[in-house]
């Protein structure tokens, strides 16, 4: 099968799966508050549990995909996603909510494998565009998923879980019957096999070796900080709409849909145009500046329209920054270590998504609703400084 067809199929698979994930985004905080009667800090823990499991399983799945192939790992993860969503539909306690997020977290650990799949079927020249497809799948999942979730919440929260599971099962079937395996049979297969055999399921030494490379380390660090800054507001964004702006689940769904649509447009095509008129250094500097400013403005937007405008600009910033950094990470990594490196990066990103919601929920409840967003802005300022003064010294960006 042609590489273009493979890209289309992996895009559809990730999109359909993330559509199910997106359905729960606007309703999880309100479900937790209205049905389970838990506070903001507990909501942060529930969100963090999902990411903590991803932190543990991302490198494991990355290494397994290097050895056994991308397709079987993706198939298993999609099935586990469906199971997690079904458990959510029957949730009547906080412990059940945590359990459902843990199962879904294992299933959601396949994104690093999907990124490795993209790396397998693209050249270094068009890899940034390929990575943008994953971002576009995220964006479209965030467009339609939250909209569907907000609308379905009118019929009960259980329905949203069943529909989310249905989407994951569609992606499951699509992957089994149509998605080709992307992992190549290298001429130096012995070397690859040795690399795999040397790695334990959670090989700290392999991670140290990868992060010891200065160019790779700074890229992973930048991605980590950005992910923390964004995860900081992941759960609190819907809480802000619910408790401060007085949004309904449907309005929260619309807001997440606006964010996702912008991200999909940027990563699905606009980033390619932007990449032709400016170099990567300029793209990263402008993006980090926009993210920093808009995060600081979110709690003070005042109205639905004001928040929508700020969110659109924020989505443009993240939509250009993330795939560019992912592309650079892939470019400075050898072919035999694409899976483990991207899996490691995804794992560290998951750890940032553990810390972010924990801090965001705590800050929202005990310090005040602006603080999760202001914290994100402060950390993004660090990204801005590193992008301007440090990153160009380590990596060729022109």
Predicted segments with their positions:
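C-terminal transmembrane helical hairpin of 12-TM major facilitator-type secondary transporters
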Residues: 279-325
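Helix-to-loop junctions at the C-terminal end of transmembrane segments
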Residues: 58-69, 266-279, 364
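Residue-level signature of mid-helix packing/kink "hotspots" within the transmembrane helices
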Residues: 22, 51-59, 109, 142-143, ...
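Helix-loop-helix hairpin linking two adjacent transmembrane segments in secondary transporters
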Residues: 134-177
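Cytoplasmic helix-loop-helix junction between adjacent transmembrane helices
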Residues: 100-140
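Conserved MFS/SLC helix-loop-helix module at the cytosolic interface between two early adjacent transmembrane helices
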Residues: 55-95
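Short amphipathic helix-loop junctions that connect adjacent transmembrane helices
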Residues: 26-40, 235-251
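Juxtamembrane intracellular "pre-TM" segments in multi-pass secondary transporters
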Residues: 2, 180-220
């Amino acid at each position: 099968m042609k590489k273009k067809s493979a890209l289309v199929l992996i895009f559809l698979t990730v999109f359909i799966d993330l559509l199910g994930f997106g359905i729960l985004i606007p309703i999880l905080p309100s479900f937790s508050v209205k049905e389970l009667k838990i506070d903001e800090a507990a909501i942060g823990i529930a969100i963090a549990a999902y990411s903590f499991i991803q932190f543990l399983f991302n490198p494991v799945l990355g290494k397994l995909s290097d050895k056994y192939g991308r397709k079987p790992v993706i198939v298993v993860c999609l099935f586990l996603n469906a199971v997690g969503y079904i458990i959510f539909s029957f949730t009547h306690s906080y412990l059940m909510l945590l359990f459902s997020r843990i199962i879904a977290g294992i299933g959601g650990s396949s994104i690093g494998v999907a990124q490795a799949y993209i790396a397998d079927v693209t050249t270094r020249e068009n890899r940034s565009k390929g990575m943008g497809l994953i971002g576009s799948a995220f964006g479209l999942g965030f467009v339609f998923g939250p909209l569907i979730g907000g609308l379905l919440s009118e019929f009960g929260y259980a329905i949203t879980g069943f529909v989310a599971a249905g989407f994951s099962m569609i992606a499951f079937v699509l992957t089994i019957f149509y998605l080709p395996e992307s992992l190549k049979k290298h001429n130096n297969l012995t070397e690859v096999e040795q690399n795999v055999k040397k790695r334990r399921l959670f090989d700290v030494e392999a991670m140290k070796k990868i992060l010891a490379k200065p160019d790779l380390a700074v890229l992973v660090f930048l991605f980590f900080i950005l992910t923390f800054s964004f995860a900081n507001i992941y759960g609190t964004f819907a809480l802000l709409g619910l408790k401060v702006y007085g949004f309904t689940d449907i309005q929260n769904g619309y807001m997440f849909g606006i964010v996702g649509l912008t991200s999909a447009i940027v990563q699905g095509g606009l980033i390619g145009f932007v990449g032709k008129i400016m170099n990567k250094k300029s793209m990263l500097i402008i993006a980090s500046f926009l993210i920093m400013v808009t995060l600081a403005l979110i709690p003070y937007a005042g109205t639905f329209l004001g928040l929508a405008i700020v969110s659109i600009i924020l989505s443009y910033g993240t939509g250009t920054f993330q795939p560019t950094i992912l592309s650079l990470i892939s470019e400075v990594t050898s072919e035999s270590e694409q899976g483990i490196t991207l899996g490691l990066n995804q794992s560290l990103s998951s750890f940032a998504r553990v810390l972010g919601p924990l801090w965001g929920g705590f800050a929202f409840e005990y310090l005040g609703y602006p603080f999760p967003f202001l914290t994100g802005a402060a950390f993004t300022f660090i990204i801005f400084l590193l992008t301007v003064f440090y990153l160009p010294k380590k990596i060729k960006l022109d």
